[in-house]
Structures are given as C-alpha cells and as structure tokens.
C-alpha cells in the first residue's frame, strides 16, 4: 500500500507533545526503545506488558470484524520468507523503490518525494554541518526497500531471499489453495495479520512508519464487473470500523488518491488517514487492484489462477 504522509512538523509545541507521548508510553509499559540498554536502535520499538495487550486487542478486533463475523472471508498465515520469484512477479524486485537523495556535505539521506517543493524546485533541508546553509543534494537514485538475506550456509545468488515487504502477496499465491479447500467462491476474501519489513530511507515518527511492522490485510476477490461496487462497500465498512473503535470523526478522514498517485495495479485507491501531532498520516489503504496480481502470478508461475463460474458458464480472473 502506498503511503503518502506529511513530513514531521518542527513546531516546538508539537515536538514537545511527541516527546511527552514517548515518555508516557515508556513509563506506563506500552512501548520501549528496542535494545534500550545499548542506546536503542534506529526506528525499532518493543511493546511492553501493557502495549502488547493493547496491540493484541486491536488485532483481535480487526480479525473478528473481518473474518469471524463474515461468511465470505477466511484467514491464513503465510510465511515471511517466500520464493524470490514471488517478488519478481509482483514487481517488487524491479519497482519497489523510493527516490533517494544525499547531501554531499553531511551525507544525510532523504526521500526526494517527501521534500517540500516551491515553484517546481525542491527545497533542501538545513545542513547540520553548515551554519545556516542548506544541504547540497545530489541526483536522485532509486533505492530498493526490501531487506535481502540468504537461505542456507552459502551466501550466493542462488540462495537469495527477501523479508516480505507486504502481506498481500502471501494471499495471492494461496488463492487456489484456499479456493480448493473451502466452499468459497467470488466474491470472497482472504485475510491475514503478520509482520512485514521495509528498509525505509527516512523512518517516521515513533511507532508510525517503522522498518519492521505488522499489517492487517484482506484481499477481496470479485467478478470483474463488481469491482467498483465492492470498492465503495469496503470504504464505508472500514471507516465505520475505525469509528466503532472509538476514533473521533474530526481526527480521521477518507482521502481519495489523485490519478497521478495511483499505483500501477490500481484503478482507484483511498487512504484512511489520522490527524497525528505532525499532521495527517495513513492508517490504512483501500485499493481496487483489479486482476493484476493473480494474472501476474499466473504468468510467472505457469499455474492457472482463474475461477470458473458454473452458473454463468464463464471463466475469469478475479
């Protein structure tokens, strides 16, 4: 899911508020800095005795609402490590990148698309090694966000694997398995909750947008002509879920993506955003992905990922 969030506001009052929140979370046992006795580790956090219960309650409330209370959604728990071909088919190996720029003086790195722009020109941040001067930014380079590792004792290209950057692909590659072992038929959904990993250039604020995080994801497979109808349905369902969770309406909004923001697989995407101390940031993305994913995996794997509707006497890719 594409995240489009405002950068942190450096207003002193908001910075103080964030510091108070972080300190409160530590005192109350909600969240601790990871590896705290060693000075912490950038953008990693541990959930304490109270925090882990709170997080568990949220996950269970989501799973109950999305799976257990519905007849047309089932759950799975896919592996974090998957065959590299999965990421080739999904486009992550070639295209899961952010534009990276680096200051030639202080060597700080920034996401180019998150820097402010004025009259078509990027406004460079202030350089910590130059008094009252801006950073000298080089040309943007594409930086792949996936964490690479090796499976087995030999570190060579034949043993390369990746920590999954999203939970969606584990759902798509199990489409036929779920179809064959349940009585489900489109429209139906597959959901899972699990860890994902993204080597973010500039991690976000506190536990928002970290390199290791948990996703709650559901993919809903429908006949092609029903896509727009179900897209509207899930936008309303998901907003209601956040309201029922106790969020104030003035602090949450549904923001449709502009056409130039849409991912290559999407014909429509909306973000559910929350008003954080630093501005609006994405909590959840709802996308009409069409048949892109199943077709891509069918082409790369050589497996038939279509569905035959006996009533309509029609075969299609949901």
Whereabouts are the PLM-identified features?
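TRNA-recognition modules of translation machinery and tRNA-sensing kinases, especially anticodon-binding
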Residues: 2-318
């Amino acid at each position: 899911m594409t995240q489009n969030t405002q950068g942190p506001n450096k207003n002193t009052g908001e910075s103080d508020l964030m510091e108070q929140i972080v300190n409160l979370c530590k005192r109350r046992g909600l969240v601790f800095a990871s590896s705290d006795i060693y000075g912490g580790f950038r953008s990693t956090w541990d959930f304490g005795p109270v925090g882990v219960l709170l997080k568990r309650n949220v996950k269970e409330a989501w799973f109950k609402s999305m799976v257990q209370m519905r007849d047309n959604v089932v759950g799975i728990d896919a592996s974090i490590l998957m065959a590299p071909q999965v990421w080739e088919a999904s486009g992550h190996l070639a295209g899961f990148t952010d534009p990276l720029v680096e200051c030639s003086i202080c060597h700080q790195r920034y996401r180019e698309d998150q820097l402010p722009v004025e009259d078509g020109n990027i406004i460079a941040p202030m350089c910590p090694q130059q008094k009252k001067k801006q950073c000298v930014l080089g040309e943007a380079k594409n930086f792949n966000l996936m964490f690479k590792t090796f499976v087995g004792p030999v570190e060579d290209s034949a043993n390369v694997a990746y920590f999954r950057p999203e939970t969606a692909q584990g759902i798509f590659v199990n489409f036929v398995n779920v179809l064959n072992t349940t009585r489900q038929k489109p429209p139906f959904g597959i959901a899972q909750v699990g860890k994902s990993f993204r080597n973010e250039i500039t991690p976000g604020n506190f536990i928002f947008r970290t390199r290791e995080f948990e996703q709650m994801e559901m993919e809903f497979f429908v006949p092609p002509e029903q896509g727009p109808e179900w897209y509207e349905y899930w936008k309303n369902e998901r907003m209601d879920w956040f309201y029922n969770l106790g969020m104030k309406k003035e602090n949450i909004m549904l923001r449709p993506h502009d056409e130039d923001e849409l991912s290559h697989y999407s014909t429509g995407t909306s973000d559910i955003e929350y008003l954080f101390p630093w501005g609006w940031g994405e909590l959840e993305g709802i996308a009409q992905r069409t048949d892109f994913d199943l077709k891509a995996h069918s082409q790369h794997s050589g497996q038939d990922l279509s569905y035959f509707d006996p009533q309509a006497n029609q075969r299609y890719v949901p």
